[in-house]
């Protein structure tokens, strides 16, 4: 079964949960390291999604600065 890709919002929510758990300090060292590693992966995912969004937004404006209509995928 294929794994569903996380949305930006899902990744941020999971990252916030991890940060709260790490700040709490009640997890074992091993669990903390696992959460930290997952947090790094989620951070990279979020950065990639933001870069993709930035590139899409850059295409909305032509080189001359003239705005063109923005159409989201599937609309």
Swiss-Prot record:
Entry annotated with the keyword Phosphoprotein = no
The EC number(s) this enzyme carries: 3.1.11.6
Q: Which SUPFAM superfamilies match?
A: XseB-like
List the molecular function annotations (GO) for this entry.
exodeoxyribonuclease VII activity
Q: Which GO terms describe its biological process?
A: DNA catabolic process
Catalysed reactions, semicolon-separated: Exonucleolytic cleavage in either 5'- to 3'- or 3'- to 5'-direction to yield nucleoside 5'-phosphates
Gene Ontology, cellular component aspect: cytosol; exodeoxyribonuclease VII complex
Known Pfam families for this protein? Exonuc_VII_S (PF02609)
Where can this protein be found?
Cytoplasm
Family indicated by similarity: Belongs to the XseB family.
Summary of subunit composition and partner proteins:
Heterooligomer composed of large and small subunits.
Q: What does this protein do?
A: Bidirectionally degrades single-stranded DNA into large acid-insoluble oligonucleotides, which are then degraded further into small acid-soluble oligonucleotides.
- What is the designated name of this protein? Exodeoxyribonuclease 7 small subunit
| Name of the gene | xseB
């Amino acid at each position: 079964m294929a794994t569903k890709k996380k949305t930006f919002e899902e990744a941020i929510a999971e990252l916030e949960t991890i940060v709260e758990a790490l700040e709490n300090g009640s997890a074992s060292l091993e669990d903390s390291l696992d959460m930290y590693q997952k947090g790094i992966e989620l951070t990279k995912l979020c950065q990639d999604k933001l870069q993709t969004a930035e590139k899409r937004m850059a295409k909305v404006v032509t080189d001359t600065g003239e705005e063109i209509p923005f159409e989201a995928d599937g609309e």
